Each structure stands twice: as structure tokens, then as C-alpha cells.
């Protein structure tokens, strides 16, 4: 193996590199520092991918459902000012999540585009190499119960769920509203906000009903780091949506 400390390898790199390319290092010390930095970046990327895959394996599906994998801001249809505002808020949320942490809740009737914009946020983050899970509360509870059946405590699943970069909890308020479900939601929001990881919520409930369901403490935590509540106050748009290959 060539000894880079002799300087021969560095000189060879300089000769072989295109004239318009500047090497990120000029000395042996800089080369070693560059290698360490690149190695750390790669390790972080692998760890993120592993976290995503572990949660997906437990849920037995990918982070974003096939129906929403092509959702983006550009193909979100705007027909009124409310939708225009929701789109603007979703874009702003995505911008903040690219470099930091924020929370959000989308509230409205079924079919009003909550999942589309949440998936658009998630898809943008996935392209940036971040980890994203959009999951219903019912699926969270099913995965927990399955872990109990396997003789596990469910702690491993909760820990993995709380380590992805963005977790979006869907269909809050549709569940049976048992004490166990409330405790699980509290644990998830508590852990994620305490570790500065973002939480999204999708619900048919209004703000007061959500506060009654989850409690004032959790709703207050959702306002951390500029958290937003966005209302989707219009009728379902699903009758106007046609999936490729499906006749309307």
C-alpha cells in the first residue's frame, strides 16, 4: 500500500485531477482530516438508512404509502385561498425541516389534501437523505401489539419510531381513544419533542377536540419551535382525483 505521508500520492492526485477541480486537501494532515470527515458523513448516512429500514420492517411497509409517493408541492391542486395558504404553510414547514425542527398539525375533513401535503413534505426530506415515516395511529398500535405477542416490551419499536427525522401520525381521533393509545401518543410526542425531532399530526378533529383527546400538555408541546396548526376547511377533493390506469 502506498504511504501517503511521502507526498508521492498527493502529487499523483494533483496530476490526475482535472484542471478545473481543486482537491479538498493540500497536505497529509488535511487529507487525514478530510478522510475522517467523509467517513463520519458516510456513517451518519448509513445510520439514518438503518433507522428507516428498521421501522419499515416492523411496520411491514415503506415510510410513505404507494398512493402518496408521487405527491409533491407542484402537483397539489389549488382551487381556493384556503388551499393556497395550506400549500404555502407546507412549503414553509418543509424548508424549516431541511435544516431544523418544527411540528405541525393538519386538520380537516377526509379528502381535503392533508395526506398529500404531508407526503409532499416527507418526499422532499427523503430526497435530502432524511428519514420519514407517515403512519396511522392504528398501525402504530398494531405494531406494538405484535411486538408484545413476540415476547417484546414494545420499547424497541417506540425507540426506533422516535429516532426517524420526521414522524407523521395519521388518523388521530379515529382510534378507539383507549387509555393505552393515549399513553402511547403521549410517549411518542414527549420523546420526540424532548430530543428535538419533528412531529406531524393529521386529524379530522378541530383544535378543541384534539386538546380534549390529547391533553393541553401535548398540544402545547406541538407548538414548540414554531409549530403550526393548519385548517383544511373545504370539501373532499377525492371525486376529482383519478389515479393513472383507473377510469373515473
UniProtKB/Swiss-Prot annotation:
Example of a GO MF term: ATP binding
Parts forming coiled coils: 33-57
InterPro entries for the chain: DNAC/IstB-like, IstB_ATP-bd, P-loop_NTPase
Listed GO biological process terms: DNA replication
Name of one Pfam family that matches: IstB_IS21
Keyword list, A-Z: Coiled coil
Gene3D superfamilies: P-loop containing nucleotide triphosphate hydrolases
Top-level taxon of origin: Bacteria
The name this protein goes by in its record: Uncharacterized protein YdaV
Organism whose genome encodes this protein: Escherichia coli (strain K12)
